[in-house]
């Protein structure tokens, strides 16, 4: 019993000892100067007191930088804020109670100095060309490793030997350049702690200044109280300060006659006098150096307009604007507005403007003034010395003029604005009336008025029929008044559309309809289709967006049952509501059968030798489509590529790694449980393989190889001519001397030695010391001004007049330049220099018999895709350049336009051969069903019927290529045109005769190219080779659409089972393309 009692007491004491065990978390600490840290003291067991003691043995209590918090009976937290070096040492946590005494735990706190930068100023500036030393001093408790980085790279790895890291870790750049400017990173690392720190230092390189006078010689007018500005443009870094000297003496800013702009780059001399004529110097100075430029001020007397006056008149009155001017010689006075020039002594055909000029005065008379005559008028006085111009403002006061639509439609409960636009000067007051009562009124609480600077809007929220009717807008100003009646008409629901055709299939029905005769005054928003099974009462409904339906006026209802009789009707809906329905029409869906042929739309990719073929699902025949079978081949190949099986949920297939400049045909067949559909055919042509020297559109207007070679040949010929002429006159030899002796009977050089000496004397220069001065007058040209005044010469007058640019147009037609079938397009004739013309790449969709028999198809002419004028892009690429032009100078400003032909894809009937698409949308190809049966492994490859070839004109092609512009499909009513219209509408310019489809190119002008090659003894290269373009034969519903061509890319054809894209895998094809050459549409472009 005694032993058990002793054991119990022993276990009690052991449990008490464990309860007072002290743990500190974390058990050790290391922080840098200025950082903060806390320690948690955890006690096992109940403690009456938990205390913290500093390294000096003092009990810690909460103070400014130290916090001691006891959370509960078992924990206490010590927090040290903004640690200093004195805070380092061993901290002790002591826990105690009355029964067991004390228990303690310790933690050692170490404090170190982080890696810091003491002396690393930023920015640091240096002078260009000097040896720069970038300073960076690093401070840390233990040594650190310093590295320098610039633009993300270590400067040590730079191949430039100018970069050197000195022993004190400074970076030296020998002969620093402006390109060395930037941010340099001084990075320090301490391996023992894994510590890293860095400082970005901005290095600025100062560049010595340069200065240049904007005008080396400035002319001014004397004694006319005018000012002249002398300007210098200085450059350097930092921006230099500019000072001025006159005859070597500094010019102070405080002088009364002289003033400067903010940066002193412009010096203004007020009230110029003859004494101000001198040589002025502008000096630029900055931290890196100094530079100087000089300007000569030459003082003349030029015209001065002494009188102009702003005028105000009332519409239909007559007024005279007067301008007086002085000057020596007497100046001539002309008039100009913001949009036109008015010559002196001029009278318009209608007598509206009359100008009379007198000595030092001109009078401009306006008769029957209109409000459009108001604006700014400029009086220009000019003489051989200079020009003066001043503006006067002519104000026209006129009675109000009301604009805006007079009929507005709405319905009850739908607010609408009736806008009355008023043009008047002075501003008019606008009031609204309803049945003679001024609005707003208590009788019309549903009416609000909103007024603006030039308009007034009446908001009407009709709640009954009484709110519809006439509303009067009256505008009044001091000149007069005007009123206008606006009619608010109650909108109605639209009338019913008219069903023209119902074409049922197994699971779908296509409804062709005409739009309602009446829209009810507001736009139609949706169409509602309703159908039901005959014998059932439940109608099925679906709404179709009017914007999508109106394009073709076709609605397709899907999800029908095969061999089932239905009734269908249509109705239109606008904002007012749903209109009347059409009479119900009955139809019966076809039995379960093979699916309809899919539609194919081809998109030639940018690389030029691959194509994305969109597969548009049609009627599935009442049975889900299992897959699509895709076959394709080059037309010149006997064998088809391996057949591809595309999942039914895939919407397109990619054909890659095709041969360049080759015609291809693609056949796609849909298959369901009942069998295979008729094949859908797509025909297209890949572009020509781009050359390595092909320039992109962004390459600017650089010269091509042909142009450079031509220029070198011309220079070489000119040098030969110069040398031969020199030998003829100086040494009596050379080709010209030989011709003169043999054909002109001139004596040889040995017969007249004395004459040679006399000839030399004759060609010697005059020894007179008198200067030879040639005086030419400058002719001032004013647009729309036939008269010109001679200008007296001055020291700045050039001895030769500048050559005025001439309009140059190359009249040689290009290879495939044809009239494009796009709306309001200007006919263009491309040349070997400024054209890449568009070689039409066509995608042909057709229905054709099986490959074993030749398909009978209607040919669709290739469409040259060019943008319409109305949709011309805001920015255009500069025309590429190639060989120099040799054609005569011709102005093409009156180039005739060609009316485009339209095309509509008709699934049931053949297309007109001249059908085309207009330029509005990206190029697409709509493929209709064909009867051609795709080849399979069991049957031999089909032999295609030889297609008729239409020769195209050939010509010199520029290495630069441009893409063909997109086209869009027009309204079906515009589809049918005569086949020859697209070409016969082309009219030759001036006296030239052009035959686009094989014929001669004629021009009465002299062909400069023939002259040049005749002088060289070589044959003239043919600019135009006659030929005929190939005609692609397609069957019923064929469509040819040009495809876009761009950059080249050759990739393997892959087949994927994803719905997004199916890539073709098979034998890699040879890649050959002819890049599309965009038609040049800037026919009026002038070149010198």
Swiss-Prot record:
Could you say which tissues express the protein in this record? Expressed in neuron and in presumptive neural tissue.
Query: Is this entry keyworded Cell membrane?
Result: yes
Ranges of Polar residues composition bias in the record: 965-974, 1076-1088
Question: Which CDD domains did the record assign?
Answer: FN3 (cd00063), Ig (cd00096), IgI_1_NCAM-1 (cd05865)
The residues on the Cytoplasmic side of the membrane are: 724-1088
Fibronectin type-III domain mapped to chain residues: 493-592, 594-690
| Region annotation Disordered: where it falls in the sequence | 758-802, 829-1000, 1024-1088
Where does the signal sequence lie?
A: 1-19
In the bilayer, the protein is annotated as: Single-pass type I membrane protein
Q: Which residues form the Ig-like C2-type domain?
A: 20-108, 113-202, 209-294, 303-397, 400-484
Keyword annotations from UniProtKB, A to Z: Cell adhesion, Cell membrane, Disulfide bond, Glycoprotein, Immunoglobulin domain, Membrane, Repeat, Signal, Transmembrane, Transmembrane helix
Posttranslational modification:
Polysialylated by ST8SIA2 and ST8SIA4. Polysialylation modulates cell interactions by confering both attractive and repulsive properties that are highly regulated by ST8SIA2 and ST8SIA4. Polysialylation is formed on a-2,3-linked sialic acid of core glycans.
* Record-listed heparin binding positions: 149-153, 158-162
Give the transmembrane region(s): 706-723
Here the disulfide bonds are 41-93, 136-186, 232-282, 323-379, 420-473
* Residues the record marks as carrying a glycan: 82, 219, 310, 341, 417, 443, 472
What is this protein for, i.e. what is its function? This protein is a cell adhesion molecule involved in neuron-neuron adhesion, neurite fasciculation, outgrowth of neurites, etc.
Its recorded name reads Neural cell adhesion molecule 1-A
Organism equals: Xenopus laevis
């Amino acid at each position: 019993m005694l032993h058990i009692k002793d054991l119990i007491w022993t276990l009690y004491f052991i449990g008490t000892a464990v309860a007072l065990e002290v743990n500190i978390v974390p058990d050790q600490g290391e922080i840098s100067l200025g950082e903060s840290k806390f320690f948690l003291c955890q006690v096992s067991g109940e403690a009456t007191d938990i205390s913290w003691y500093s390294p000096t043995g003092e009990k810690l209590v909460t103070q400014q930088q130290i916090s001691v918090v006891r959370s509960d009976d078992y924990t206490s937290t010590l927090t040290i804020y903004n640690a200093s070096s004195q805070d380092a040492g061993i901290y002790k946590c002591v826990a105690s109670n009355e029964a067991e005494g004390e228990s303690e735990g310790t933690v050692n706190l170490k404090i170190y100095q982080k890696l810091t930068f003491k002396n690393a100023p930023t920015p640091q500036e240096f002078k260009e060309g000097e040896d720069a030393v970038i300073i960076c001093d690093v401070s840390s408790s233990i040594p650190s490793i310093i590295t320098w980085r610039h633009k993300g790279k270590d400067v040590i790895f730079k191949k430039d030997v100018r970069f050197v890291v000195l022993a004190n870790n400074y970076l030296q750049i020998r002969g620093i350049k402006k390109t060395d400017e930037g941010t340099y990173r001084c990075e320090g690392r301490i391996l023992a702690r894994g510590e890293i720190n860095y400082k970005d230092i901005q290095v600025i390189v100062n560049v010595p200044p340069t200065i240049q006078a904007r005008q080396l010689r400035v002319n001014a007018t004397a004694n006319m109280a005018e000012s002249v500005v002398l300007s210098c443009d200085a450059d350097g870094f930092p921006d230099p300060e500019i000072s001025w000297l006159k005859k070597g003496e500094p010019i102070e800013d405080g002088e009364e006659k002289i003033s400067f702009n903010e940066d002193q780059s412009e010096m203004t001399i007020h009230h110029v006098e003859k004494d101000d004529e001198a040589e002025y110097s502008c000096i630029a100075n900055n931290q890196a150096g100094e530079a100087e430029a000089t300007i000569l001020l030459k003082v003349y007397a030029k015209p001065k307009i002494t009188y102009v006056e702003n005028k105000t008149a009332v519409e239909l009155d007559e007024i005279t604007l007067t301008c007086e001017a002085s000057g020596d010689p007497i100046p001539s006075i002309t008039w100009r507005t913001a949009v036109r020039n008015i010559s002196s002594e001029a009278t318009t055909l209608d007598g509206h403007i009359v100008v009379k000029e007198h000595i030092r005065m001109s009078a401009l008379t306006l008769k029957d003034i209109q409000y459009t005559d108001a604006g700014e008028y400029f009086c220009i006085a000019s003489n051989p010395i200079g020009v003066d111009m001043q503006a006067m403002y002519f104000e026209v006061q006129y009675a109000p003029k009301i604009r805006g639509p007079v009929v507005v439609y709405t319905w009850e409960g739908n607010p609408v604005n009736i806008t009355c636009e008023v043009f008047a000067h002075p501003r008019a007051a606008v009031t609204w009336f309803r049945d003679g009562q001024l609005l707003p009124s208590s009788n019309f609480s549903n009416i609000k008025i909103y007024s603006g600077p030039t308009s007034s809007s009446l908001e009407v929220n009709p709640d009954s029929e009484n709110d519809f009717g006439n509303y009067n807008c009256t505008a009044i100003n001091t000149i007069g008044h005007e009123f206008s009646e606006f009619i608010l008409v109650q909108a109605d629901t639209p009338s019913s559309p008219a069903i023209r055709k119902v074409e049922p299939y197994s699971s779908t029905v296509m409804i062709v309809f005409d739009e309602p005769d009446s829209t009810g005054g507001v736009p139609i928003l949706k169409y509602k289709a309703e159908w039901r099974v005959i014998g059932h009462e439940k109608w099925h409904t679906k709404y179709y967006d009017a914007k999508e339906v109106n394009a073709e006026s076709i609605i397709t209802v899907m999800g029908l049952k095969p061999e089932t009789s239905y009734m269908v009707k249509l109705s239109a809906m606008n904002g007012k509501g749903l209109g009347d329905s059409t009479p119900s029409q009955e139809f019966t869906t076809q039995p379960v059968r093979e699916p309809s042929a899919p539609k194919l739309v081809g998109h030639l990719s940018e690389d030029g030798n691959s194509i994305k073929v969109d597969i548009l699902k049609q009627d599935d025949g009442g049975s889900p489509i299992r897959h699509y079978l895709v076959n394709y081949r080059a037309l010149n190949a006997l064998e088809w590529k391996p057949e591809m099986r595309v999942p039914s949920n895939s919407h397109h297939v990619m054909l890659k790694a095709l041969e360049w400049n080759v015609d291809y045909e693609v056949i796609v067949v849909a298959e369901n449980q009942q069998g295979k559909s008729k094949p859908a055919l797509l025909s297209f042509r890949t572009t020509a393989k781009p050359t390595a020297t092909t320039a992109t559109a962004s390459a600017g207007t650089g010269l091509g190889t042909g142009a450079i070679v031509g220029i070198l040949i011309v220079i070489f010929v000119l040098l030969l001519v110069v040398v031969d002429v020199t030998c003829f006159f100086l040494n009596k030899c050379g080709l010209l001397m030989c011709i003169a002796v043999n054909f002109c009977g001139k004596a040889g050089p040995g017969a007249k030695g004395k004459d040679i000496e006399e000839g030399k004397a004759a060609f010697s220069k005059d020894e007179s010391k008198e200067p030879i001065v040639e005086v030419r007058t400058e002719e001032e040209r004013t647009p729309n001004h036939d008269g010109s005044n001679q200008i007296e010469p001055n020291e700045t007058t050039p001895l030769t007049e500048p050559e005025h640019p001439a309009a140059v147009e190359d009249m040689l037609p290009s290879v495939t330049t044809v009239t494009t079938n796009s709306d309001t397009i200007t006919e263009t004739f491309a040349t070997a220099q400024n054209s890449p013309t568009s070689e039409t790449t066509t995608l042909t969709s057709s229905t054709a018999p099986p490959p074993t028999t030749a398909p009978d198809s209607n040919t669709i002419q290739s469409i040259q895709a060019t943008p319409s004028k109305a949709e011309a892009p805001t920015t255009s690429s500069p025309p590429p350049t190639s060989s120099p032009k040799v054609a005569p100078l011709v102005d093409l400003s009156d180039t005739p336009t060609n009316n485009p032909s339209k095309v509509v894809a008709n699934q049931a009937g053949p297309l007109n051969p001249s059908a085309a698409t207009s330029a509005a949308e990206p190029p697409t190809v709509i493929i209709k069903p064909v009867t051609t049966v795709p080849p399979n492994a069991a049957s031999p490859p089909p032999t295609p019927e030889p297609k008729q070839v239409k020769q195209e004109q050939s010509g010199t092609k520029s290495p630069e290529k441009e893409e063909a512009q997109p086209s869009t499909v027009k309204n079906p009513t515009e589809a049918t045109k005569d086949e020859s219209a697209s070409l016969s509408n082309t009219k030759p310019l001036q006296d030239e005769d052009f035959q686009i489809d094989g014929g001669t190119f004629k021009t009465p002008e002299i062909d400069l190219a023939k002259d040049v090659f005749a002088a060289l003894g070589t044959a003239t290269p043919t600019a135009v080779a006659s030929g005929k373009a190939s005609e692609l034969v397609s069957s019923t519903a064929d469509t040819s659409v040009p495809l876009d061509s761009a950059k080249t890319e050759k990739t393997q054809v892959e087949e994927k089972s994803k719905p997004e894209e199916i890539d073709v895998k098979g034998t890699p094809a040879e890649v050959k393309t002819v890049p599309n050459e965009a038609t040049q549409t800037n026919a009026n472009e002038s070149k010198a």
